[in-house]
């Protein structure tokens, strides 16, 4: 079953194509990495998929339904690249925000999740009072707490320390492997994609490559964009991770 299907998607800004003729599908249970240079349209693509932006042409389906009629948003967890909505006036504590949208509260899981994101000591603080990195950890905790069927992360670890970053990626991989959660990770870090994702979409305003990471490693796209030395390091890391997993 396709969790996401995108057909011939084009989005323009000021008359210029930001993304053009994008077609791909994400099957249930896949860990997909979307990678590309700055300005390649990665975040724009995600915003079109979620209906935040309206495409100039093309079609998006979520869980088999056209985006225009899709209403099952509890199935989706999304962390945007910029947390501009969170400010000093946001009326909620960390623990309230992290549990937002949950049908059943679970104090034990809440505490464990907050501690894993190293914000357990901030549970009673207003989220708008936190630093950007602390806010980001709180929103990651919210996405993980909800256990949705689809998780979408747009550059989720930019303000995290290396240890918390590793914990986060390991948690998303565990949810993917054990729970069958479909994960989409948008990043500029091809090494992270190689370590955690099964499939890869390389975007530069249009789809340059779509397929498994293994196939990407042997493609001319990989060699052309990253060079043979980086290709060897990244692909060897991917093979080692898969054999150990």
Regions found by a protein language model. Give the residues of each.
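Conserved ABC ATPase signature
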Residues: 126-130, 134
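Conserved ABC transporter NBD signature motif
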Residues: 58-72
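Conserved ABC ATPase "signature" region
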Residues: 107-124
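ABC ATPase nucleotide-binding domains
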Residues: 214, 218-245
